Structures are given as structure tokens and as C-alpha cells.
Amino acid sequence: MNKLVKNYLNIPIIETERLILNYPIETDFKILELFLKSERSKFVGGPYRSFSAWNDYMANIGHWSLYGHGLWSLRIKDNNEYIGRVGIIKPAMFKEPDLAWQVFKDYEGMGYAYEAAIAVKDYTIHNFKFSSLASHIVEGNKNSISLAERVGYKIKKEEIIDKKKFIIYFHM
């Protein structure tokens, strides 16, 4: 079981029935790196090399520091196992804040991404003053498109961002 370290950025902790959405810790990186270096990361800019995976991991921590939001580490409540990330990001090339999720292969199809996305959406509505909240999904990412629709998002537009076609779903 991972030992949790001090939460220097005062990142809120969200609990659901089966999950804990917690701040990133150093030991998360090795597991995240496996995902980011795999073909499964193709919809989030991968596959990455090790240094780029580290930059992605650190950029998330920077998000928390600069904006007060970012990706939570997604953990199973019963055993504290790290199974993915979910949260709000705002890359410079996006016009709206983005509800994003990544669940690792062995945990897909179990409802974890849905449970976490609903929790983050609810937290965001009650704790941030965003005028809109979107999910920017690369065309062809059928699993994420399906999840966005289940979470209650409606397709609003398509846009080319950084030479990729994104389908942008909106909640607010």
C-alpha cells in the first residue's frame, strides 16, 4: 500500500462509494509512466518517452499550484491502489476548463471512471466559478465519448487543436 505524503498544495480529497480521489504522490509516477508509454495513451498525446511522461506528471502538479485544480490520483478505497487520474485541467490551447479522465487498462469497464467523473463534476460545480465545463475528446476515442455522454455532457462543437480533431462536450 502506498504511503501518503504531506499534501503541500492542500489539494482537496474526494471520496465516493468505492474510490478516493487524492493528491498525486511520487510513487504514482512509475505506474502512470507505464500507461503514458503504452499505445493506450494515444488519445492523450502518447505514447510518450520517459522524460515526456515525467513532464506530463509534473505539469499536473503545476496545474494544482497555478490554478487550484488538476488531476487527482484515482485510488480504490479498499486497498489504496492507484488506478488512474481524473480532474479538471486547462491547457493553454483549450478555451474552457476540461474534465479529463484516464483509467488504467485493468480497471476499465468497472464504472470507476464514471463514478470519479460524476464526483469531480459535482465538486467543480459547487467549488469553482467556471462559466462552462467541457471535455475535449480526440476523435475516435469511443470509450471517452461514451463516458462523456453517460456523465450528461452534450456535444457542442468540433475543433482542430494542435493538428488533432477534438469533439468538445459541454456540461455548463
Model-predicted segments: where are they?
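Acyl-donor (CoA/ACP) binding surface of acyl/acetyltransferases
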Residues: 1-43, 58-62, 71-172
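Short, surface-exposed alpha-helical recognition segments that flank or form part
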Residues: 48-49, 112
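Active-site rim helix/loop that mediates acceptor-substrate recognition in acyltransferases
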Residues: 49-68
